[in-house]
Curated annotation (Swiss-Prot):
Gene encoding the protein: CSN3
Modified positions (Phosphothreonine) in chain numbering: 163
Annotated disulfide bonds: none
Family: Belongs to the kappa-casein family.
Subcellular location, record wording: Secreted
Protein known as: Kappa-casein
Tagged with keyword Glycoprotein: yes
Organism: Sus scrofa (Pig)
Signal peptide coordinates: 1-21
Keyword Nucleotide-binding: no
Distribution of this protein across tissues and organs: Mammary gland specific. Secreted in milk.
Residues carrying Phosphoserine: 167, 185
Any Pfam family the entry gives: Casein_kappa
C-alpha cells in the first residue's frame, strides 16, 4: 500500500499542471473558435506542398510518370518549365518546346498480374543424396506393453498389445492357462 501511494503522488503532481492547461486551452477555443479555424484553413491552402500534393491525382504504381518541377522554381503550382523571356525588339526567340523530362502515362495501362499467377520453378538439389522411398505396406510388429499391476484372485494373465492399426484401442489377448466361464443373462 505504501509503495503504490509513493508512485501515485508524483504522477498526479506531474499531470495536474498539464490537465489545467488543457482546460484553459479548451475555453480559449470556444471563445474565438470560428476566427481561428478560418485563419488556419486559409493558411494551409497557400502552402506550396499542399498545392503539389493536391495537384496530381494518385495514379497507383505510375507515380514515376509525373513531370518534375524545376528546382529553381519551387513555389510554382504547375510542373512545367517557364520559357525564357528575352527583352528587346530584335531578339530572336528559341524555336524549341519545353517538354517534361519524364513522359506521361499511356492511355492503356498494363494489368499487374497477381503473385499467384507467377510460375516459380522448383529448386534443383543436385548435391543432396536421394531419399529412399518408405514401403508403407511393410508389416509392423506389435509392441508389447507389460502389465503394471499384479493380478490377484487367481485370474488369468492379460497382456495389452498395441498395434499401429488400432492406435486408440488396446487389444487384449489371454495367456494359454485361462479357463472358460459360461455367462447366462436373465431373460426379461
Amino acid at each position: 500500500m505504501m509503495k503504490s501511494s509513493f508512485l501515485i503522488v508524483p504522477i498526479l503532481a506531474l499531470t495536474l499542471p498539464f490537465l489545467g492547461a488543457e482546460e484553459q486551452n479548451q475555453e480559449k477555443l470556444t471563445r474565438c473558435e470560428s476566427d481561428k479555424r478560418l485563419f488556419n484553413e486559409e493558411k494551409v491552402k497557400y502552402i506550396p506542398i499542399y498545392y503539389m500534393l493536391n495537384r496530381f491525382p494518385s495514379y497507383g504504381f505510375f507515380y514515376q510518370h509525373r513531370s518534375a518541377v524545376s528546382p529553381n522554381r519551387q513555389f510554382i503550382p504547375y510542373p512545367y518549365y517557364a520559357r525564357p523571356v528575352v527583352a528587346g525588339p530584335h531578339a530572336q526567340k528559341p524555336q524549341w518546346q519545353d517538354q517534361p523530362n519524364v513522359y506521361p502515362p499511356t492511355v492503356a495501362r498494363r494489368p499487374r498480374p497477381h503473385a499467384s499467377f507467377i510460375a516459380i520453378p522448383p529448386k534443383k538439389n543436385q548435391d543432396k543424396t536421394a531419399i529412399p522411398a518408405i514401403n508403407s505396406i511393410a508389416t509392423v510388429e506389435p509392441t508389447i506393453v507389460p502389465a503394471t499391476e499384479p493380478i490377484v484372485n487367481a485370474e488369468p494373465i492379460v497382456n495389452a498389445v498395441v498395434t499401429p492399426e488400432a492406435s486408440s484401442e488396446f487389444l487384449i489377448t489371454s495367456a494359454p492357462e485361462t479357463t472358460t466361464v459360461q455367462v447366462t443373462s436373465p431373460v426379461v
